[in-house]
Amino acid sequence: MQLSPVTLPTTAEEAMAVQDDLRARVVAANPRPPVFATVAGVDSAYDDAAGLVATAVVVLDTATLEPIESAVAHGPVRFPYVPGLLAFRELPTTLSALEQLRTTPDLLVCDAQGLAHPRRFGLACHVGVRTGLPTIGVAKNAWGAWTEPGRRRGDAAELVLDGEVVGLALRTRDDVKPVFVSVGHHIDLPTAREQVLALTPRYRQPETTRQADRLCRAALRAATGG
């Protein structure tokens, strides 16, 4: 994939202004019939002592959930930790890993928030806007208010922030804590829900996230000699 270089803001105020500017580009609708033959998971891991971040992208065949291709990138953390500005810590290595792919995935799934974010522009939105690809955020924790969905796989409850529905608390396993699904870019919420369920046949987390998590942790260990 060919992507334009990323220039990071230098302050939290500048970063929030970037989010506010790019938010208008998010499309919360399917741009075409939502048929996804390939899906890529994106996840990052940190070594705080070394000041490093490693990101992995794993492309799966949606029919089998078997890996087709993967890529990793690591580098120094170039932006401080500020709640709501996680994207600026992970975006450089995320885009670097995506650029290495020979396969352009039909869908991206980020272990992060999308519209379920204080400024409605989490990492999944940022990556989606930068790549132009349909993107979903699937987070382990929620921004916003939600009620417990039903106990069965597939049960969902709205995730609400400032009176606006920004995502779903989605049960992917019976009697297991839900994940929090939100639109990143070029997809609607019902389709995002459907795709996340397709990616969770056995575990709470999508298979995309599980495989990317393993790979980014291995890449970080290799980078730090751990």
From Swiss-Prot:
Site (Interaction with target DNA): 81
Predominant localisation class: cytoplasm
Molecular function in Gene Ontology: deoxyribonuclease V activity; magnesium ion binding; RNA endonuclease activity, producing 5'-phosphomonoesters; single-stranded RNA binding
Cellular-component GO terms for this entry: cytoplasm
GO biological process, one term: DNA repair
Keywords: Cytoplasm, DNA damage, DNA repair, Endonuclease, Hydrolase, Magnesium, Metal-binding, Nuclease
CDD domains noted in UniProt: Endonuclease_V
Domain of life according to the entry: Bacteria
Cofactor(s) the protein needs: Mg(2+)
Keyword Nucleotide-binding: no
InterPro entries, sorted: Endonuclease-V
Enzyme Commission (EC) number: 3.1.21.7
Positions of Mg(2+) binding: 43, 111
PANTHER family tied to this protein: ENDONUCLEASE V
Membership in a protein family: Belongs to the endonuclease V family.
Described function: DNA repair enzyme involved in the repair of deaminated bases. Selectively cleaves double-stranded DNA at the second phosphodiester bond 3' to a deoxyinosine leaving behind the intact lesion on the nicked DNA.
Name of protein: Endonuclease V
Species in which this protein is naturally found: Nocardia farcinica (strain IFM 10152)
